[in-house]
Amino acid sequence: MATPEKNLWNRLKTKLPKGTHKTRVENRAGTGVPDVHLCVAKTAFWVELKCTKGDTVSIRPSQIAWNMQYSAAGGISFFLVSRVKPPCLFLFDGGEALRLATDGLGSGSLAAAAWAGDDLATCVSFMIDRASSWAR
């Protein structure tokens, strides 16, 4: 049976533009490296996939450290969070990892979400545009 993150990955793949180079990282070492590496239109970035049943987002300390250090070094990364009920998608910049882990979706961190909604295609388009603008 597929995990919720695997299902989110399968949905995400169908919404990526043609020609996207995509790599799903199956990392069991706990180093904090995000789940997915994407390269679209000469822009490379990382995406950590998270699924939650409520407002709490479970993020390991190694994931927080990796994303915050990567962001501080000028790297581009995101957290794509899928909440089951009520259903909604949230996109956070990787540099917001600590705040997301601490505050979750419902304790003020929502204001820090770069994007929120229920349409994955729109989320993907926003994520690519945001990554491209940072890469310039």
Language-model segments: residues:
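Nucleic-acid nuclease catalytic cores
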Residues: 71-97
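Conserved catalytic cores of phosphodiester-cleaving nucleases, focusing on short active-site segments
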Residues: 36-38, 42-53
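Active-site-adjacent loop/helix micro-motif of nuclease/hydrolase catalytic cores
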Residues: 53-64
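Sequence/structural signature of beta-propeller domains
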Residues: 57-58, 92-103
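Acidic-basic catalytic patches of nuclease active cores, encompassing PD-(D/E)XK
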Residues: 1-27, 135-136
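Charged phosphate-binding loop/patch that engages nucleotide di/tri-phosphates or the phosphate backbone
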Residues: 108-136
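Beta-rich catalytic cores
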Residues: 32
